[in-house]
Amino acid sequence: VSQNLMRGMSDTLFQPDGTLTRGQLMTILYRMAGTPETEAATPFTDVASGRYFTDAVAWAYEAGIAEGVSGTTFAPNAPVTREQLVTFLYRYAKYQEEDVSAQGTLAGYPDAEAVSEYAQIPMAWAVEQELVNGIDGKLAPKGAATRAQIATIILRYYAIYGE
C-alpha cells in the first residue's frame, strides 16, 4: 500500500481476504511498471474508457502480459485465478527482462495435473522462485487469488528482482 501499488477498498478497509479481480491485478502490474504511457486500444468490449483499469489493461495487452478470456472479452471484474496470477506475473517479469529460466517441479503437489497447459511453465517458475508456496500443500490453480496473496507475492517478487 505504501508503494501505491495497491489501494484499499475504501479509505479504512484493505480487505486482505477479498478476491482479487483481473482488472485489479492489471492495475497493480501497471503501477509496478511505473504507469507507462500507452496509446494502445484493446479489442475488449468490456473495458470501457475512463475506468480505473482501462489504461492498465491496454498497456498489459500491448506489452503481451495479458490476454482476454476471449478475443473481445477481458472480464476485468472476474476473480483472477492463482494460475492466471502467476502467468501474468511471469509475463510481467519477461517484459521487465528478468531471468525467468528457473523452473521447479510441480510433482510434489497433488493437484499439479489441474494446472492448465498455458500456466505450467509460469507456475513452475513461481514455485521455484518461492513466489507461491501452495495452500494446505496444494497449488489450487483454479482457486481465486486474494488481495493478501498478491501483496505477499509482490513482496517476494521484489525481494528477488528488486523494484
Which positions does each model-derived feature cover?
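Feature responds to low-complexity, polar/acidic, surface-exposed segments characteristic
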Residues: 2-55, 63-83, 89-119, 133-145, ...
